[in-house]
Amino acid sequence: MTPIYLQRGALHSALGADLRAAAAALQGGQRPLPGSFLLHELQQPRPYLAVSDSGESRQQRCDRLLGETLGEQPGELDDCLLILASTSLDIDDLERLIAAQGGFRPEHSTPLDLLAEDLRQRWGFADAFTLNTACTSAANGLLYGARMLAAGLYQRVLVLACETPSAIAQQGFGALDLTSPSCAYRPFHPERDGLILGEAYAATLLAREPGEAPLAKLLGGFSACDTSNLTTTREDGSHIDWVMREALRSAGVDAGQIGLVKLHGTATGANDRAESNGVRLLFGDALPPLCVLKPWLGHTLGACGLSETLLLVKSLDKLPGVDYADEALLPLSAEPTCVAADSLLLANFFGFGGNNASLVLQRCTGENA
């Protein structure tokens, strides 16, 4: 795969108002305090990590995010593709409309590309695509953007990922018994009891050239669907192992060169078992350092492929440990982890429905930009 640069990036999350603040909070081990929603089926509260209320609409947040990523004077964008990656898209708008009008009507339906097309028209992007592949949406956005750049179809690609609070996600994941009743987000803990959903908005500008101060290089990656089950992936880890191997092959590296694995780590039963087995199939006993980020961001669903990627590359000098390392299914660290700035990184994103993706990344330093 042709290496592609993440020239700039922006993040708004429960962990911080911007990427710098989120990285500082992560390195300081500061977890955001979750709010809650009522799980109707059980009439019980469940935690939720929301972005601080700024009074902005989703459109205003996305515009601000694009401004942070493109700069104050972005110029013409007729050489730039927009890829919008999200699970929720505009479902929260639809939910409010249904509530206001007393039920759903056929005319309430909107096209899948409504948000992306609105941004394309207002900002002047060359084209706009929408990716909706569950928790791999943004990771797939990075991969598709990289392929289009390598093919010379566009000069730049702006990947925008957003995940807003919605009843269908909250109630749906809750009904599947996937949300944590204890509010303890513990990926790979033997007594883990589910995930904490999170809100996030993230963006990055991709290009073949590094630009002035690039964040990272996307060296390779792979995405595929495990069709053995309608909702999950094979718990023996075989499909995850294959996806990671193909990602490494596309980058021209082997498992022994990986300096850190960013695990998907949802803290759900089946997903953590599958990932744990897959990681052990790939690395055997020679596991590199491992980290999880969802306890600090929440599971940002369609946005996690970008929100976690940006946070990862900004925090390599101090990634927090977990307080249950001795019990974990994989050898997580109890102490903060520091890896070399130019380490090769493997980042995993495994989606509901069996769509699995892995990225091979390297943070840009003065020497390797």
Describe each PLM feature range.
Residues 153:
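Glycine-rich phosphate/pyrophosphate-binding loop and the adjoining helix
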Residues 156, 161-166:
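Glycine-rich anion/phosphate-binding loop at the beta-strand->alpha-helix junction
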Residues 138:
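Short conserved active-site loop signatures built around small residues
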Residues 1-128, 147-150, 172-196, 202-204, ...:
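Conserved "HGTGT" condensation-loop signature of ketosynthase/thiolase-family condensing enzymes
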Residues 141-142, 205:
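Active-site alpha-helical elements of protease catalytic centers
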Residues 130-132:
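Short beta-strand-to-loop elements that line the ligand-binding cleft
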